[in-house]
Regions:
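Flexible loop/hinge segments that line or gate small-molecule binding clefts
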Residues: 69-75, 108-139
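Short helices/loops that flank or line small-molecule/ion binding pockets
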Residues: 90-97, 118, 210-219
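Extracytoplasmic ligand-binding site segments that recognize negatively charged/polar headgroups
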Residues: 126-139, 171-186, 234
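Structured C-terminal subdomain patch of bacterial secreted/periplasmic proteins
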Residues: 28, 132-142, 151, 162, ...
């Protein structure tokens, strides 16, 4: 009896041990859902920022597919395309059988619900915002078992985006074409991080085409503008210098117009640090 009991006990202990080892690690997403993994999961996403952060921490090999808008880094272009943010190709996603589909908290909940019904688990990151970028990087590090490299990238990012009063409270606009980034926008937060006063905050809307009388009253001392090419940069600068209202502003008169590469300011990924570096360097010189 003693031998039988011992054998049974050992068998149970061994089974329990291997059952416990079946899940090598667990990760909890931004919504508090726990996921258990034996190894780094194969994933898919339709969000450019998530794609960029996945590659930034060295987890690109686990990304099966992304959206048609995911074009950075170069390797991202070679991934299978599964539609876009508002029109994901559900059939193709299911056919790829990813372990998880990664979405931000701001994503349309209907997308997650439909994917869940199709048997695809959704891992949710935080919402948009400079403060959430490093949090998402750290979470992705845990997700792909790359915590050490992710922590370094997140820490470097946190250090890079610490508020610095290089702007001295000067009045500024961040322009996207003829639209100004106002309160609560990602680009507006960049102005705050530079120690600038965002003129567009007083408009009361996140995005607005600035009325001429408002431009005159605001009289910005600094203008930041996104550009995607030398051609768009030249066209935008020509607009500011020839427009009867904008050309009267202190910013234009003193040639304080700074152009920032579009892809560093429209995608809330770790590349935002590049935009801030450009902006702060300009402010220090001007």
């Amino acid at each position: 009896m003693t031998f039988r009991f011992s054998a049974k006990f050992v068998a149970t202990a061994v089974a329990t041990f291997f059952a416990a080892c079946a899940f090598a690690y667990s990760v909890t997403d931004a919504q508090g859902t726990r996921f258990d993994f034996e190894k780094p999961p194969r994933c898919a996403t339709v969000v450019p920022a998530i794609t960029q952060n996945i590659f930034a921490i060295g987890a690109g090999e686990y990304l099966l597919a992304n959206s048609r808008y995911c074009d950075f880094p170069e390797e991202a272009k070679r991934k299978i395309k599964i539609g876009g943010y508002i029109d994901p190709d559900y059939e193709k996603i299911v056919s790829l059988k990813p372990d998880i589909f990664i979405l931000p908290a701001t994503a349309d909940s209907r997308v997650a619900r439909r994917l869940e019904k199709l048997g695809i688990k959704c891992f949710v990151l935080h919402g948009e915002g400079i403060a959430n970028i490093s949090a998402d990087v750290r979470m992705l590090g845990k997700l792909f078992d790359l915590g050490k490299s992710a922590e370094k990238i997140a820490a470097d990012f946190d250090d890079a985006v610490k508020p610095v009063n290089s702007g001295g409270g000067r009045r500024a606009f961040f322009m996207f074409g003829k639209m100004a980034a106002g309160r609560g926008t990602f680009a507006g937060n960049l102005l705050t991080a530079c120690g600038l006063a965002n003129c567009a905050d007083k408009i009361g809307r996140p995005w607005a085409e600035v009325p001429r009388e408002f431009v005159l009253a605001a009289n910005p001392e600094i203008i930041f503008a996104e550009c995607e090419s030398e051609k768009s940069r030249a066209e935008t600068e020509r607009f500011f210098r020839t427009d009867p209202v904008w050309r009267t502003t202190a910013a234009v008169k003193n040639s304080r117009i700074c152009f920032v590469p579009r892809d560093t300011v429209i995608v809330p990924s770790v590349r935002v640090a590049e935009a801030l570096k450009i902006m702060r360097a300009f402010l220090l010189k001007n």
